[in-house]
Amino acid sequence: MDRTKRGLWTALSVLVLVGLWQLGSVVAPESIPSVLATAGALITVLTTPGPYDRMFYYHVWKTAEMLLITLGISLVLGTVVGIALGTDETLESSLSSWIYAWLAIPSLVIVFVAAVLIGFDARSGYLAVPIAITPFVALNMWEGARSLDPQLGEMAEFFGAGRYQQFRAVIIPQLVPFLFASIRSALSIGWKITLLVEAFLLTRGVGFMFRNYFDQYELATMMSWLVIFVAFLVVIEYGVLAPLRRRMTAWRPDAEGVRLSE
């Protein structure tokens, strides 16, 4: 499907979503604010200082700061653990069950335990978010490491490639699709946990604003904050991740009927 058709289908899906949203506001006006009410609240949020006399971009930046820092930590730790598990049978046999147990721990429990251990401040978030999302990255990279083609490694050794050169030119290119899958899953999970941390522990960030306006039952304003942060994530996906993925997978030939680049 070419970009024009994809753009049309995307626009159509957005219109359908907005239509369903408006229909929901008609059916249940006490629970779902209308599109126009949310748009009005959005304009107010974008132009008027909120609690503690802070503009919207302060809260978006604080949430993005925690999310991106913890995402980077999780990607490094998860990639190292995943590659180690996928390339070492002893480690895989010893630690695989612990990874699945780690995945089963509820994120909310991790947030509360971090708060008890460290305190009700931002440090708890910087601990809780990596703990919660690192196993998802590790699981993706583990599967990627298990699918590495050993013949490529043998060929690199035959031509005298060193360990670093093999890692950079043979292993990493094969793991790129799994790395981007890890980034997307970590981002989608990480922002939810970041908002939980802010809602329960902090007095700044998008999560705090959600809780603040939920407590006041200002649903239109709460929805406007959701629109702001979803827009931020869409920019990250299509403005950063998609172009980067296309660039890093440009060397891969397209299989018939399959698009490897977005």
What does each model-identified segment do?
Residues V27-G72:
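Periplasmic/extracellular loop-to-transmembrane helix junction in inner-membrane transport proteins
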Residues Y100-F136, E143-G144:
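Generic hydrophobic transmembrane alpha-helix motif, especially the helices
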Residues N140-S182:
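Short cytoplasmic-facing helical segments at TM-TM junctions of multi-pass membrane proteins
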Residues L127, I131, Y164-V197, S224, ...:
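Transmembrane alpha-helices
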Residues V206-R245:
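Hydrophobic alpha-helical transmembrane segments of polytopic membrane proteins
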Residues K5-A28:
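N-terminal signal-anchor transmembrane alpha helix
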Residues R245-E262:
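Short cytosolic juxtamembrane segments of multi-pass membrane proteins
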Residues I69-I99:
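Transmembrane-helix boundary motif in ABC transporter permease subunits
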